[in-house]
């Protein structure tokens, strides 16, 4: 049994309030200073392991607004995979890869005692730094850089001055053709054994974060500061995704120390495409992982602070996102990265029917003044559909763990160091691949599980393991050399589909009728081309794109790439040109990226362009 040291922090002196101060998170107008003093309380059965620097569990006691609080913390043991590595590049381009010891780290999750809705994400590396939610309000805590090293500042998130007044938005505009209307609760209770395979135990998104050269410049070549910033990001991302039963272990950190390895520009869509190609060609063959996010300090175009592909988790090129390091507050950047990973997991922007209990939700198209750490009801339902429809195998396998430190015991049904399997006692073992006496696989075993594994042996090469979902998707076949079905691939973008009504885009065939059907239901019919002339107006709902908050009217050749219009017909009601427009989510109801707008032409960023330009 893992032994735990409990640590209690009490106040050495009374806290006091300050009116204004400049902290790492920015200018803070109202803050509280506390002086924690560490007092250890050792239960008789708890003995700290001598090689361990940071405890597995801790408690911190301090006051907030005169109210005593007890903060319980537990080490986030899913923060790193066992094979975590870091790579940077020499001036002549050579890869320099190290495997730092990260098992005994200082990043924690927690909660406030007697507050069931509280949460916390804290770094205890040098004092306490992070955030916690208390009585429904978000607080930040950080050490003060004073001669008295015990001083900490505690302040409400709302008391941090805004860095600027501009809205900050995700650059994703494509919808997934699914309605955001509430799904009956009963449907959430229907779970087949196949679905249960994904929800219990946790899913794992093995993540590599790539830091570009602009970040190195921003942090003045301080790689330690970059590592700390990234670790805090991933710690918070894990706290966010736990509500979806997803763990996000960091398997690697790439730092482009001397120069960028792709052309990183402010055009988010271009950078995203180039990063996806680099990941597929160079990063994935070198390091197995499920998803990679590019973190950049470059100011992305317009109001965009992030962009990612939708429903592409586990795909070699498209399981990526681009995130701007847009704030001094780590939480805001973490929420942005969680949002983009959410897109990869099949989540689209929340609509008017979506809620997460009164907060601005993770998948809101606009980052709120107080960023939420919660997913909406729509996101939960979309994620479940993504799992059952796409079968993303890569997130099923757990990463190598770093937290099993007790001696292995064969027969306890726990996979521990030195064991290849553990199916329990020989009398109870039901695993034909495992020798229960030795906890080793039988010598003839080729595999244990996977879509290309049957009775502990690889399925024959050519056996279909993932059928094509539609004419834009490819069927995958077993190789005869692996238990895993090959990476999900689809036909090239621009391939004609649906009897030439559309062109393939990222494995789907986007056409206007399908988008209208998803937005308005079955009472829609084909729309008249004349309706799209409204998009030439450049008014509040009818336009092609936005630049610096200004709505740009469509040129005549681009009018089919702005607001979508649908022909709606029901008993006693006929609307020939019905737009879908919601002020809170103006991007929803725009014509999807990749939709056909003419022969050999598709919509791309609000313009009707030739296929060879778009793809």
From Swiss-Prot:
Residue ranges of the motif D/ECD-tripeptide: 471-473
A Pfam family of this chain: ADAM_CR
Domain Disintegrin per the UniProt entry, residue ranges: 407-493
Keywords for this protein: Calcium, Disulfide bond, Fibrinogenolytic toxin, Glycoprotein, Hemorrhagic toxin, Hemostasis impairing toxin, Hydrolase, Metal-binding, Metalloprotease, Protease, Secreted, Signal, Toxin, Zinc, Zymogen
Annotated compartments: Secreted
Family from the record: Belongs to the venom metalloproteinase (M12B) family. P-III subfamily. P-IIIa sub-subfamily.
Protein name: Zinc metalloproteinase-disintegrin-like daborhagin-K
Function field: Snake venom zinc metalloprotease that possesses high hemorrhagic activity (minimum hemorrhagic dose (MHD)=0.82 ug) when subcutaneously injected into mice. May also potently degrade alpha chain of fibrinogen (FGA).
Propeptide boundaries: 21-189
InterPro entries assigned: ADAM_Cys-rich, Disintegrin_CS, Disintegrin_dom, Disintegrin_dom_sf, MetalloPept_cat_dom_sf, Peptidase_M12B, Peptidase_M12B_N, Reprolysin_adamalysin
GO terms for biological process, alphabetical: proteolysis
Cofactors, names only: Zn(2+)
GO cellular component, one term: plasma membrane
Enzyme Commission numbers on file: 3.4.24.-
Active site residues according to the UniProt entry: 340
Quaternary structure (record): Monomer.
Stored PANTHER family: ADAM A DISINTEGRIN AND METALLOPROTEASE DOMAIN, DISINTEGRIN AND METALLOPROTEINASE DOMAIN-CONTAINING PROTEIN 28
Residues bearing glycans: 263, 269, 377, 523
Residues bound to Ca(2+) 1: 206, 290, 394, 397
Binding site for Ca(2+) 2: 412, 414, 416, 419, 422
Signal peptide range in chain numbering: 1-20
Disulfide bridge partners, by residue number: 314-394, 354-378, 356-361, 410-439, 421-434, 423-429, 433-456, 447-453, 452-478, 465-485, 472-504, 497-509, 516-566, 531-577, 544-554, 561-603, 597-608
UniProt-annotated binding residues for Zn(2+): 339, 343, 349
Activity control: Addition of Mg(2+) or Ca(2+) increases the casein hydrolysis rate.
Domain Peptidase M12B residue range list: 203-399
């Amino acid at each position: 049994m893992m032994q735990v040291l409990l640590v209690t922090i009490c106040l050495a002196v009374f806290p006091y309030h300050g009116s204004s101060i400049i902290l790492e998170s920015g200018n803070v107008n109202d803050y509280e200073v506390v002086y924690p003093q560490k007092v250890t309380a050792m239960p008789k059965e708890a003995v700290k392991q001598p090689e361990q620097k940071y405890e597995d569990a801790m408690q911190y006691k301090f006051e907030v607004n005169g109210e005593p609080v007890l903060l319980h913390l537990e080490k986030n043991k899913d923060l790193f995979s066992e094979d975590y590595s870091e790579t940077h590049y020499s001036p002549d381009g050579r890869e320099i890869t190290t495997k730092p010891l990260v098992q005994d780290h200082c990043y924690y999750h927690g909660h406030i005692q007697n507050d069931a809705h509280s949460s916390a994400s804290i770094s205890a590396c040098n004092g306490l730094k992070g955030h916690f939610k208390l009585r429904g309000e978000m607080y930040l805590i950080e050490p003060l850089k004073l001669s008295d090293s015990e001083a900490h500042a505690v302040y409400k998130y709302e008391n941090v001055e805004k860095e600027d007044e501009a809205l900050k938005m995700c650059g994703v505009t494509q919808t997934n053709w699914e309605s955001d209307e509430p799904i009956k609760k009963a449907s959430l209770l229907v779970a087949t054994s196949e679905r249960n395979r994904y929800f219990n135990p946790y899913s794992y998104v093995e993540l590599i974060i790539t830091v570009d050269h602009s970040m190195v410049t921003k942090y003045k070549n301080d790689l330690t500061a970059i590592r700390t910033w990234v670790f805090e990001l991933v710690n918070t991302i894990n706290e966010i995704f736990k509500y979806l039963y997803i763990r996000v272990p960091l398997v690697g950190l790439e730092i482009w120390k001397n120069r960028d390895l792709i052309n990183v520009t402010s055009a988010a869509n271009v950078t995203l495409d180039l990063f996806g190609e680099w990941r597929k060609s160079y990063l994935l063959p070198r390091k197995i992982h499920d998803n990679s996010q590019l973190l950049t300090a470059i100011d992305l175009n317009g109001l965009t602070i992030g962009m990612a592909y939708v429903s592409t988790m586990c795909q070699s090129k498209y399981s990526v996102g681009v995130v701007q390091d847009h704030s001094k507050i780590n939480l805001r950047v973490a929420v942005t990265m969680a949002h983009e990973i959410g897109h990869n997991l099949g989540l689209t922007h929340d609509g008017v029917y979506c809620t997460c209990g009164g907060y601005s939700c993770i998948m809101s198209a606009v980052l709120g003044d107080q960023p939420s750490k919660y997913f909406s009801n729509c996101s939960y339902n979309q994620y479940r559909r993504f799992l059952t429809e796409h079968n993303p195998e890569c997130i099923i396998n757990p990463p190598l763990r770093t937290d099993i430190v007790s001696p292995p015991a064969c027969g306890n049904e726990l996979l521990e160091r030195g064991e290849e399997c553990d199916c329990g006692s020989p009398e109870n073992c039901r695993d034909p691949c495992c020798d229960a006496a030795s906890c080793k696989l039988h010598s003839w075993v080729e595999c244990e599980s996977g879509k290309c594994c049957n009775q502990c042996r690889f399925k024959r090469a050519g056996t279909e393991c993932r059928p094509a979902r539609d004419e834009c998707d490819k069927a995958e076949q077993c190789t005869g050399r692996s238990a895993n079905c090959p990476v999900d691939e689809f036909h090239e973008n621009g391939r004609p589909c649906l009897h030439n009504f559309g062109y393939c885009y990222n494995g789907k065939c986007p056409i206007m009728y399908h988008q209208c059907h998803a937005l308005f239901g079955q009472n829609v019919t084909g729309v008249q081309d004349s309706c799209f002339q409204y998009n030439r107006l450049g008014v509040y709902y009818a336009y092609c794109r936005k630049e610096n908050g200004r709505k740009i009217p469509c040129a005549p050749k681009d009018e089919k790439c702005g607001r979508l219009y649908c022909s709606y017909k029901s008993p006693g009601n006929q609307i020939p040109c019905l737009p879908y427009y919601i002020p809170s989510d103006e991007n929803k109801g725009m014509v999807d990226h990749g939709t056909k707008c003419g022969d050999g032409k598709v919509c791309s960023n609000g313009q009707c362009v030739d296929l060879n330009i778009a793809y």
